[in-house]
Amino acid sequence: MEIQDPIIVMHTSLGNIRIKLYNDTPLHRDNFIKLAKEGTYNGLLFHRVIKEFMIQGGDVTSKDAPINKQLGAGDLGYTVPAEFIYPRYFHKKGALSAARTGDEVNPEKASSASQFFIVTGKVYTDAELNQMEKQKEARLKQTIFNRLQTENKSQIMNLYRNGEKDELTILKDTLIGKAEMETERRKDEVKFTPEQREIYKSKGGVPFLDNEYTVYGEVIEGLDIVEKIENVKTNSSDRPLENIVITSVEIG
């Protein structure tokens, strides 16, 4: 018998948000439940709010933080391995996703231990989604080419040191060709499914975050509270001018 996805209730100073955590992302599910039971989230703030994008919380230094304090760096000293269940789970409006540090220091896209965001996003047109697919395909091709360069680094360096420019050009063209062929084979990875397209066109979300951050739950009640938080006034650092507090997180 299939075990039901666990439900948590996030009590905030603006109202309650009911969230389903996915059993398909057990590392994130268990980590969130553990922190909730320990009271880690009690008193923390939604410290970063961007209209038509998301609301973010979980900075462990945000509790009772002065209104002028810069927030966003507070965490628990460990990360949670990425759990991409794509395209089943994506950044539709109401998705619960894990914050993380950037690719340059975190190429594995591991998640923050405590920081999360809830997607608000916006509605997209077919033309905009088509353009995003092209951009995703270009990024995939570049990623593949970079990997091939790394795999052939010693040969490239030898040709470069020996001044063999023609051979270097031939090798580069060969790697570009291989990258294009692999991209063509993996084209489906950058295509939106019919379900994604329909939701992004009707309810909205943030499609360019897909396969970049781990989605591990979704709001099932209280989306109006999420929207209320999304629309508060913020300062130049996207911090609300009046503190929005997570008073507690209840399991079930």
Which role does the model predict for each range below?
Residues M1-G252:
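Cyclophilin-like peptidyl-prolyl cis-trans isomerases
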